[in-house]
Amino acid sequence: MMNIRTLKLTNLGRFEELDVHLAPVEEFKSNVTVFIGNNGAGKTSILKSLATSLSWFVARVRTEKGNGSLIPEDAILNGRSSATIELQVLNTHPATEAATPYRWLLARTASGKKSTTASSLQEASQLAAFYRDQYTQNSGASFPL
């Protein structure tokens, strides 16, 4: 089972820096995270960023070197040279119940700007390889939704 623990956005959408801790968290043991805000507050930016980051995991489950969606250039915060999405997940092994953390970072630099951050997708690839191995051994294996 895979649980998304944190999502960090830097210079993306309207956020200079945003850390979102998804349920469950220490204070609240609920399994539900709710985003509430006025129009234009950034709820859609958060969800699109989550989908963009997870698209790399899904693509690498399908094929070893698969490519997911890129951060759109127009999503980079005005006046900034780059934007990043960092995702941290916790994957629990079905047989051993051992929980392993994984983290990956997706970066986008604006055209004509110097790159300051690079994407780091090694752990997304490792997690995808784990699920490909599980599926190879058992075609009825479960995948995270």
Predicted region positions:
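A broad, low-specificity signal marking well-ordered, structured residues that form hydrophobic/aromatic
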Residues: 7, 33, 83-85, 144
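Glycine-rich phosphate-binding loops of NTPases
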Residues: 95-145
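Conserved P-loop NTP-binding catalytic core
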Residues: 47-116
